[in-house]
Curated annotation (Swiss-Prot):
The keyword Hydrolase is assigned to this record: yes
Protein name per the record: N-acetyldiaminopimelate deacetylase
Provenance organism: Bacillus pumilus (strain SAFR-032)
Gene3D superfamilies registered for this protein in UniProt: 3.30.70.360, Zn peptidases
A Pfam family this chain is assigned to: M20_dimer
Length: 376
């Protein structure tokens, strides 16, 4: 079976080849090449776009236990100084998906050599960071023949020490939505503002107004966030901007709050149209459903891991993080948990450096849990 050093070597291989959503061609090829070493009597594989379904056969299966591992990297120039740094310029595994895949391979390896009664399905999912791979992957015909009875996933957590996992029954991660607002006015010479409709000014006004949406429309005991990450507009210092664009994100802890926030944003955009004599178009290119953990399965998992001393178990609060694993939990019961990796730098940071000892912790937790669920 794969030992700690071999698992770390796999993680470092994957770390060097981060790829964006639905472009994970090298990553998929690496996984297939690794898994091809196992006997076809023990595993079956089905590709799905740039993702992969892998079934580890049980000895006398009546159920299917599933585990999802996301695959894609981010458009972030790496600044870790690793000797195994990304070879893809401007791209990095800055959210731990290299560890997620490595952990899945470790669990697969264990059960290839020591099978349990039930079948295990591993879903290597592309495009978690965008545009979203979970929802379309669920439409695959593969899931008609390998239908999970429950599904699990994990995500690295830089803020927790190695040897700690954190989760909670119920809502774990927020509903999230991308937000794009296009403003179209009338450009002109900087010396003649009265003959133009300045979209930089309109965009500035709208950003300020958006700050009132949460504070005056969302229950103070609820939580929601609107963040405008980029504003673009204009072409030169002496030209009044005809166009401006706001790109951001909305995050809420309930679908109802998401609907309310969107309505208020659209109302403010209409006000900008009137006040600045322009055209405002509001779009939501993609959105992720909340991660809502099964109460029964999560409580059982937390109790088992704590009682067996497999990891330190923390019941955490919900987070405003977005995760398309929520779509999988809409279809199948299951849960997600945080895996402590003790990094000084956080997720999506160019210097994220997770402690690789966490890989072994996660493999041990998941193999023990699947054995327990199979009654072994």
């Amino acid at each position: 079976m794969l030992n700690r050093e071999q698992l770390i070597s796999i993680r470092r291989d994957l770390h060097q080849i981060p790829e964006l959503g639905f472009k994970e061609f090298k990553t998929q090829a690496y996984l297939i090449n690794h898994l091809d070493a196992y006997s076809k009597d023990r595993i079956e594989m089905e590709t799905w776009r740039t993702g992969l379904f892998v079934k580890v056969k049980g000895t006398n299966p009546e159920r299917v236990f599933a585990y999802r591992a996301d695959m894609d990297g981010l458009s972030i120039p790496e600044d870790t100084g690793y000797p195994f740094q990304s070879v893809h310029e401007g791209k990095m595994h800055a959210c731990g998906h290299d560890l997620h895949m490595t952990i899945a391979l470790g669990v697969i390896d264990h059960f290839v050599h020591e099978p349990i009664k039930e079948d295990l399905l591993f879903m290597f999912q592309p495009a978690e960071e965008g545009p979203g791979g979970a929802e379309p992957m669920l439409t695959s015909d593969v899931l008609k023949k390998w239908t999970p009875d429950f599904i699990t996933a994990l995500h690295i957590a830089p803020e927790y020490p190695v040897g700690t996992i954190a989760t909670k029954p119920g809502l774990l991660f927020a509903n999230t939505s991308e937000l794009v607002i296009d403003l179209e006015g009338k450009g002109g010479h900087a010396a003649y503002p009265h003959l133009a409709n300045d979209m930089v000014v309109a965009a500035s006004a709208l950003v300020g107004q958006l700050q009132s949406v949460i504070s005056r429309n969302v229950d103070p005991l609820d939580s929601a966030v609107i963040t405008i990450g980029t504003i673009t507009g204009g072409t030169a210092q002496n030209i009044i901007a005809q166009h401006a664009k706001l790109d951001g994100t909305i995050r809420t802890l309930s679908p109802e709050s998401m609907e309310k926030v969107r309505k208020r944003i659209e109302a403010l955009a209409k006000g900008i149209e009137i006040g600045y004599e322009c055209k405002a178009t509001v779009r939501y290119p993609s959105s992720y459903y909340e991660v809502d953990n099964s109460k029964e399965l999560t409580e059982e998992f937390m109790s088992y891991v704590a009682e067996e001393g497999l990891a330190n178990v923390v019941e955490c609060r919900e987070a405003m993080t977005g995760e398309d694993f929520g779509y999988m939990l809409k279809k199948y019961p299951g849960f997600m948990f945080w895996l402590g990796v003790d990094s000084e730098y956080g997720l999506h940071h160019a210097k994220l450096m997770p402690d690789e000892k966490a890989i072994e912790t996660a493999v041990n937790v998941m193999t023990a849990y699947f054995k327990k669920q199979a009654g072994e």
